[in-house]
Amino acid sequence: MAVSAALPSDSISTFWEEYPNIRIDAISNYEPPNFNVLDVDLGFTFEPPTGSDLVIVASRNVKYGFMATPEYLKKHGEPKSIEDLIANHRVCGKFGHYHYLKVWKDIMARSPRVCFSSNSNFSVIKILRAGGGIGVLPLQYANDGGLRLLTEIKETPEVTFYLVAHRLTKDIPKIRVVIDCYRKIMMSSWD
């Protein structure tokens, strides 16, 4: 269930213990899922769905923060402002949905020191944990896995995260079970 770095997946083992025959195929995409082309029943998106076949079954605002390893910050110092970050620090980021985070989009566009970008959240997280630079991640990663939330930069970008289902299949029992599991995760406290 790690279909997005914004969604914690701590409860997956209990889900499959209860529903061992349900298979989840995760497809990562920049654009909102095209349910007809991908032949999928539900998906996550940072945009409200368009079209009458899709419905929002859950949504959540996800808060992000600027993060780096303590080792990177010890060696390079913590930026005092967005301008300091842009001018003096290595930036590691994800292209794709980060354009929904306006302050991060501006940093990625203006920084002469973007040293790493990827379409994979997990690659960005791995590079940040290796001391690659400073990035923006959902707050659930703060003080976890070797990353520390920067305290000098006060901006906390936020984006709405939607769980979207196909209107005609959302009430099929095995799909409803997955929807309910994701909804429970989305409504839990994780930022």
Task: Set out the residue ranges of the language-model regions.
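Loop/helix-junction capping segments adjacent to catalytic residues or to phosphate/diphosphate-binding pockets
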Residues: A5-A6, K75, D144, I172
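Central regulatory/effector-binding core of bacterial HTH transcription factors
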Residues: M1-S52
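C-terminal regulatory
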Residues: V37, P49-G132, L137-F161, S188-D191
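A late-sequence structural motif
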Residues: I153-D191
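Short histidine/acidic/glycine/proline-rich micro-motifs that form metal-
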Residues: M1-V3, Y72, T169
